[in-house]
C-alpha cells in the first residue's frame, strides 16, 4: 500500500496530543520525527540519545498502538538518533511499503553495527575527560590499547567508586575492536569470573573454562578486589594470568585499592598484579567535573547555563557516576516541569550534601523499616517480593552512605547477604535515582531522619 510518511506521522501526532499531557507531548513526542516505513518497521528519530531512551522506556508501546490503529496492522518501532537515508523514497516523500506477515527490519535500513554485549557504547576514549586526577591512567590505557602486551602488562587501574576505571577499561576494548574487529576482547567482573568457574566445576568442564579465558587477546577484569578470600578462584586466575602474560596478551585489572591492600590476596598474585603499572585515579577537581558535565551535555545535545553546570559540579565532588546521574536527573525534571533551567529551580531536586554523621546500623534499619511499613525481620529476610526487595536495597544503600561498615559487614546486618548483593543493591538504587524523582525524595527524607537520630 502507498503511505505518505509525513501524513502518517501527522496523524500519529494528532492522536498522541489528545492522549498525553501537554508538557509530555511537547517535550518528548513533538520533537521526534518519522524517518522511514519499510517491511512493517517504522523508524522514528529522536533529537538526542536521552530523548530516545526516554521514548523507549515510557512511550514506545503507546506510539506502536496508535500506528497500528491508523495502518490497520502492527508495526515494529525502531528508535534512533541517526538520520536515515532511504534510497527508495521518491521526490514526493512517498515510501512504498508491502504488508507482510512478519516484522523484519528493511535491508536498506541504516542501523549501527551491534557492539559486544559486555561493552558499553558510551565508554570510549573520545568521551573520557582527562584531568590532573586521571592523566596518567588515561595515557597508560591509551598506550595499552595501541600496543597491547608491551610496556604496561598488566595495567592495574586503582581508584574509588565512580572515578572512571570501568570507562577506561572498556575504552581499551573498543579501541582494539575498531582496529581489529575479530580480536578476542574479554571484559568481565571478578564475580562473573568466579561464577563461570563455579559453573565449570559443577558441569565438570574446567578445561573448557580455561580454554575460553586463555583465548583472550585482551582480558579486562573489573573489581579484582573481590577475589579476596576466594582461594580456588585465585588459583585459577593465577594460571590464566600466567598463560596470557607469557603469550604476550594484555591483562588490565581494576580495583578500588592497590594490590598490596587487598586482604587475603596470595603473595604471588600480588607480585604479578604489581609487575606492570599501577595507575591511580583520584577524585576530579572542580574544573574537571565541570568539563565532564559539559561533554556529557554536548553528547546529549543539551544546552545548560554555566552557573547550573558549576552548581551541579560543586554538589558532587567525588563520584563521576553520581555527577552524571545528577545531570540526568536535572534535565529530566526541567523537561517534565517545563521550568526554566536555573540554579533556583534545580536546587530542590539535587540530594543535598549535608555533613556526614556516623549512624548505627540499627538506626538505619529502624528508619527504613518504619518508612516502608515493614518489620525488621522482613528487611533481614530473603523474601523477593518487590516492595520488600526495594526496601532492602534502599537500606543497604543508606547503610553504606551513613556508616563506615564494609560491604561484607553490611551483608551480615541484612541477614548474611553476600557482599556482591550489597554492591548490586547500592548500584541499583544509585541508577534508579537518575530517573525516579520520587525515590530521590524518599532517600533524602530517610537520610535526614537518620542524621536526626544520630544527633539525638
From Swiss-Prot:
Cellular component GO terms held in the UniProt record: cytoplasm; plasma membrane
Which residues of the sequence carry a binding annotation for ATP? 162, 164-166
| Single Gene Ontology MF annotation | DNA replication origin binding
The secretion signal range is none
This protein is called Chromosomal replication initiator protein DnaA
Region span, Domain IV, binds dsDNA: 335-456
Assembly, in brief, is: Oligomerizes as a right-handed, spiral filament on DNA at oriC.
Using the UniProt annotation, give all residue ranges assigned to the region (Domain III, AAA+ region).
Answer: 118-334
Region Domain I, interacts with DnaA modulators: list its residue ranges: 1-73
Disulfide bond residue pairs:
none
Q: Which NCBIfam families match?
A: DnaA
Supply the domain comment: Domain I is involved in oligomerization and binding regulators, domain II is flexibile and of varying length in different bacteria, domain III forms the AAA+ region, while domain IV binds dsDNA.
Q: Does the keyword Nucleotide-binding apply?
A: yes
**Upper lineage ranks?**
Bacteria, Bacillati, Cyanobacteriota, Cyanophyceae, Oscillatoriophycideae
Q: What is its main location?
A: cytoplasm
Q: Which Pfam families match?
A: Bac_DnaA, Bac_DnaA_C, DnaA_N
Q: Which family does it belong to?
A: Belongs to the DnaA family.
Q: According to the UniProt record, where is the region Domain II?
A: 73-117
Q: Which SMART domains is this protein grouped with?
A: AAA, Bac_DnaA_C
